[in-house]
Amino acid sequence: MSFYSDASLVMIPSGYKDQKVYCAVPTDGSADLTFSRASSATRVQSNGLIEKVRTNIILQSEDFTTTWASNVSPTITANTTVAPDGTTTGDTIAASGSNSGAYQVPTVANGVEHSFSVYVKNITSATAIQIGCDLGPVNGFLNFNAVTGAITTTAAGITGSSVTNVGNGWYRVSGTYITTGTTNTFIVFGQSGMTFAVWGAQLEAGVTTDYIATTTAAVSVGPVSGLPRLDYLGSTCPKLLLEPQRTNLAIYSEQFDNAGWGKTQSGTGLVPVITANNAISPDGYQNADTIVFDVGAGTTSSDISAMFQTFGGTTATYTGSFYAKTASGTAQIQVRIDGSNYDKFTITNQWQRFTLTKALTGTSNVFEMAIRRGLNEPMNASATIQLWGVQVELGAYATSYIPTLGASVTRVADAASKTSASALIG
């Protein structure tokens, strides 16, 4: 006999589906838990990376003969080419004139970082394929030469771009831009005499991530609403993560170059310099920012280099948190959320989540990260750190990360329950 064989109910976090957590004992399903959470969430995966919900808002991502509209009468033929996934689902676009191809007009959030991507392959003379979004005040498109595999030009709105050679003549071309409206036009245009294959179009908030196939509706992957979270934080074995409702009050939690984050200086200090999306973050994608704080030759507490954001609040206990590392060595920074005393943190070359909990007494509070000189302050004159995932929440401890864009985001409480369990647990 063993504890396992004697047990009337055993739940080993492993089997689950939407709104359900399976129990190992009994095996007839009578003890399975009903799960609910009316919002998306995040979790730590078995590989140690944070998994967020990702959404491809482009419809019919592999069929350009359906939802997609045509511009300047191209000839679009479905399923002519072996796609990067090995299926014959790549479509061919034969352009008939200038900017001839397919387009789609999805709805997006205004003023938010988005990334487009699509796989393309040269068939005939495809040296100037126009790919991108946002045919508005700030254009977010680029020109790609599918013969050479190079981006030749980028429009003013592009903040970053990349090309990945995935083999067999296919390239994944992507670009990042800030939306300037709520409707953007995703374009894949060629020029007269060009023929090229296309497959796997994607548009998503944030930076480019792994491809998500769609048909008649947008598709989200990750810990979506109603899906239980098996979390591996601090362990090689998962646990069923059940958390209370929390709201991240810090907006643009990963986009520190956004105007939602103030940058300031005092005395000999310099305004922090921010380079967006140039480091791999704890979620495994290149969406962490590098921030350089510098107070120059100053030695007093008036010499400050800082970035900040006002988050409101009430008279209560709040917890701030952030992920940070250096490229090499260590650096000291100071953080406060109560508008008063700074907490000092030593940042190393490994990603860590740092937290601070304070009792706040007002309704206009500030998350501030800085270098400040003085007798009782860190004495490094500058610090270069990689930053990601700032969170400010009402509560005495930090919960799992809640990503935000232009507004605060609430993760609804997890709940797992089993009714009529008396026969199982006596």
Predicted regions and their residues:
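Extracellular and organelle-lumenal recognition/adhesion modules and their flexible linkers in secreted
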Residues: 1-426
